């Protein structure tokens, strides 16, 4: 097979687009800010297809299983993995911020901070309790779940639909085949949308640099540097160790999903790569039913980057405002975040809302301190989103292996660059994942 020129690779195109966006934002900030609709438009196009893709993938995955016990086992294994790894991420963030103490010596008086810009985040955070979160998983209407694009609500309905379709047996086969064909159509739509990914990445990055300026990267830089290094070490050491224990290399895995990582880097939302991740993980050898359950669920229950951010940001605010935090306060913070972090969706800004909710719930920490990190939160969201994406990908492979639903040969071939999915020039193939 003849390789297409490197400049036609989505990986190269997005990388160049991000570089141009940064340059435009630095030299012509006013023009760069006007590019925001390109980034917003691309993310909206992706979100438009997420709900039906999740529905089709989950329904065909569950309905096509031999036994419902397999679904229960997969869900249980996934939740166990999510809880263990996200707890480790929270603890790592807590340990690092206590060792480095990036907020020490700032001596900020919370009463002097401008809280007008954080009012919306604080209000949104106060509204979300644990009971509210659990009740919100059940959609008011099926149409409402799809219209609002709520991942957990769509997932909840999809699991019920898939279970009901499975119970129908051969009588439900025409419905199963129809949904499978719709799935191919939806992945072709994503293939078309991804053609404009470089434009979306350019617009989002240009706006970020133009609106906040490169100078804002220097302000509060110690916290940002500390956070980025922690995320990097978490991916290489923690996720790398998990990957090695399950027979694959984290570096090869990162190379395999490099295009998705660049899309996330440009948009700062791990959700923007969700459809392609579902397709990529299936091509990696993970069973369709496992991918359909683990990837969407992970966007609320397995946000490793967000977990690191939440503990580091909360303790940073305490350090900067000279708010004492003894071991009891920190354990309380950890326990609150074990619950609150599960309510963060993989969309831009959700981590900041959960942080506001956490500060309100703990009570000991000044909510006004959010104003300290509001300016750099947009830059930190990129590290969060990248870590979240890698974490969910690793989780899918691990859970697939635990459930004996992983094709080891395909996994090794794809990660070695010998398969079609790992080729730099490959997008989602025209015609879907396979001919219908």
Curated annotation (Swiss-Prot):
Record region (Disordered): 414-436
SUPFAM superfamilies hit by this protein: Proton glutamate symport protein (SSF118215)
Bilayer topology term: Multi-pass membrane protein
Entry keyword Transmembrane: yes
Any GO CC annotation of this UniProt entry: plasma membrane
A GO term for molecular function: malate:proton symporter activity
UniProt keyword annotations, A-Z: Cell inner membrane, Cell membrane, Membrane, Symport, Transmembrane, Transmembrane helix, Transport
Ligase keyword on record: no
Classification via PROSITE patterns: NA_DICARBOXYL_SYMP_2
Parts of the chain that traverse the membrane: 14-34, 45-65, 77-97, 142-162, 198-218, 223-243, 290-310, 331-351, 353-373
Compartments, record wording: Cell inner membrane
GO BP terms: L-aspartate transmembrane transport
Family, similarity comment: Belongs to the dicarboxylate/amino acid:cation symporter (DAACS) (TC 2.A.23) family.
Xref: NCBIfam families: PRK01663.1, PRK13027.1
Record function comment: Responsible for the transport of dicarboxylates such as succinate, fumarate, and malate from the periplasm across the membrane.
Protein name: C4-dicarboxylate transport protein 2
Species, as recorded: Pseudomonas paraeruginosa (strain DSM 24068 / PA7) (Pseudomonas aeruginosa (strain PA7))
Organism placement in taxonomy: Bacteria, Pseudomonadati, Pseudomonadota, Gammaproteobacteria, Pseudomonadales
């Amino acid at each position: 097979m003849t390789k297409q020129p490197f400049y036609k690779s989505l990986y190269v195109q997005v990388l160049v687009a991000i570089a141009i966006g940064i340059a435009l934002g630095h030299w012509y900030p006013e023009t760069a800010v006007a590019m925001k609709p390109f980034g917003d438009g691309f993310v909206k196009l992706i979100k438009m297809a997420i709900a039906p893709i999740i529905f089709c993938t989950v329904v065909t995955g569950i309905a096509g299983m031999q036994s419902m016990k397999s679904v229960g086992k997969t869900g249980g294994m996934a939740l166990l993995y999510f809880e263990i790894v996200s707890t480790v991420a929270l603890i790592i963030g807590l340990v690092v911020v206590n060792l480095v103490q990036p907020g020490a010596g700032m001596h900020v008086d919370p009463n002097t901070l401008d809280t007008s810009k954080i009012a919306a985040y604080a209000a949104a955070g106060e509204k979300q309790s644990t009971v509210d979160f659990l009740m919100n998983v059940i959609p008011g209407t099926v149409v409402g779940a799809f219209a609002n694009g709520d991942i957990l609500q769509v997932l909840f309905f999809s699991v019920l639909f898939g279970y009901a379709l499975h119970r129908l047996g051969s009588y439900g086969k025409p419905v199963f085949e129809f949904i499978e064909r719709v799935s191919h159509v939806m992945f072709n739509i994503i293939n078309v949308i991804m053609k404009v990914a470089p434009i979306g990445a350019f617009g989002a990055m240009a706006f970020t640099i133009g609106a906040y300026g490169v100078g804002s990267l220097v302000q509060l830089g110690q916290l940002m540097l500390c956070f980025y290094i922690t995320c990097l070490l978490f991916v290489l050491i923690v996720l790398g160790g998990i990957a090695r224990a399950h027979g694959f290399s984290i570096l090869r895995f990162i190379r395999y999903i490099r295009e998705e990582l660049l899309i996330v880097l440009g948009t700062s939302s791990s959700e923007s790569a969700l459809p392609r991740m579902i397709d990529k993980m299936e091509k990696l050898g993970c069973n369709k039913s496992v991918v359909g359950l683990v990837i969407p669920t992970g966007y609320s229950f397995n946000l490793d980057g967000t977990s690191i951010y939440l503990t580091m940001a909360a303790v940073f605010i305490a350090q900067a405002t000279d708010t004492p935090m003894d071991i009891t306060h920190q354990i309380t913070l950890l326990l609150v975040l074990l619950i609150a972090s599960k309510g963060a969706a993989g969309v831009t800004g959700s981590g900041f809302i959960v942080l506001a909710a956490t500060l309100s719930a703990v009570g000991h920490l000044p909510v006004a301190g959010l104003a300290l990190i509001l300016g750099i939160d947009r830059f930190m969201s990129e590290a969060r989103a990248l870590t979240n994406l890698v974490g969910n990908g690793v989780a899918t492979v691990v859970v697939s292996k635990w459930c004996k639903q992983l094709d080891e040969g395909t996994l090794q071939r794809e990660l070695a660059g010998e398969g079609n999915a790992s080729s730099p020039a490959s997008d989602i193939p025209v015609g879907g994942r396979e001919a219908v």
